[in-house]
A protein has these predicted regions:
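N-terminal intrinsically disordered/low-complexity leader segments
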Residues: 1-14, 147-148, 153-154, 208-232
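Basic, helix-initiating cap at the start of DNA-binding domains
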Residues: 1-42, 59-62
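Short hydrophobic clusters on alpha-helical segments that form packing/core surfaces
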Residues: 19-27, 68, 72, 97
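Alpha-helical DNA-contacting segments of helix-turn-helix folds
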Residues: 58-71, 111, 132-135, 139
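Hydrophobic alpha-helical connector segments
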Residues: 78-106, 166, 190-193
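Amphipathic alpha-helical linker/stalk segments
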Residues: 64-90, 112, 121-122
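Amphipathic alpha-helical packing segments from all-alpha helical-bundle domains
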Residues: 119-151, 157-175, 191-202
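Short hydrophobic/aromatic patch on the recognition helix
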Residues: 43-54
Length: 232
């Protein structure tokens, strides 16, 4: 590549970074469903410029997602590395995730969900490909590494399945919390992070042990292995 071509490439990369930054600010202010026209207007340019650099809205979501999710991944990794125990590590990671998402729910939703057209084609499922897929794969590996050293050999099934299951719990609970309007019953970020960490480590066993006395006892309730007997 000659000097002129190199300068042009550098200019395009810089312009692309500027557009991503402007789009992020616009989405933060306007909402996750902001149109390309609205985003371009907020950025002080035309939507044709955004189409030229990103192709379509999904391409812009992908580009913004690469930046946002990379920052989230670094923050979560730093939080995990500062922990002294596995449980502290989980809490630190969950807390960092919620903090980053809470910083701008609009931007978080913009980079983790398909555009309306794409959602219709995929039955409205949440995006898990591209930058988002890489993000969750990296977080899963981040969880699995200390588990492997802590649990030792012979626990491949736990190490293989649990990190992804944990991510599903954290993400779904976190997104529901993020979308919930403020109310006296809504926990703050730290309380929500601790609650999710407790669910990851203990499940809902503590709540079951403190169930009301008139509720069915787990020892007498029918189970899958012991069906309820029919009365004669």
């Amino acid at each position: 590549m000659d000097g002129r071509a190199s300068r042009w490439q550098s200019h395009r990369e810089e312009r692309r970074r500027e557009l991503i930054k402007s789009a992020r600010k616009a989405v933060h202010a306007l909402g996750s469903d902001a149109s390309m026209e609205d985003i371009a207007a907020a950025a002080g340019t035309s939507k044709s410029v955004f189409y030229r650099y990103f192709g379509d809205k999904a391409g812009l979501q992908q580009a913004v997602g690469e930046v946002v999710l990379s920052q989230m991944q670094r923050r979560i990794q730093e939080a995990a590395q500062s922990a002294q125990t596995p449980r502290e590590g989980l809490f630190a990671m969950v807390s960092a995730y919620l903090q980053m998402a809470e910083t701008s729910p609009n931007v978080y939703t913009f980079v983790t969900h398909y555009t309306p057209g794409d959602a219709q084609a995929t039955n409205g499922t949440i995006a898990t490909a591209g930058a988002l897929g890489h993000f969750f794969a990296a977080i899963s590996d981040m969880i699995a590494r200390p588990m492997r050293s802590h649990l030792g050999d012979g626990r491949e099934a736990v190490i293989g399945y649990w990190p992804n299951a944990a991510i599903g719990l954290v993400r779904n609970a976190g997104e529901q919390w993020l979308a919930s309007p403020a109310s006296p019953s809504k926990p703050d970020q730290e309380a929500m992070a601790r609650q999710i960490t407790d669910w990851l480590c203990l499940g809902i066993a503590p709540e079951l042990r403190t169930a009301a006395p008139n509720q069915t006892s787990p020892t007498t309730a029918p189970t899958l292995s012991e069906p309820k007997k029919e009365s004669t």
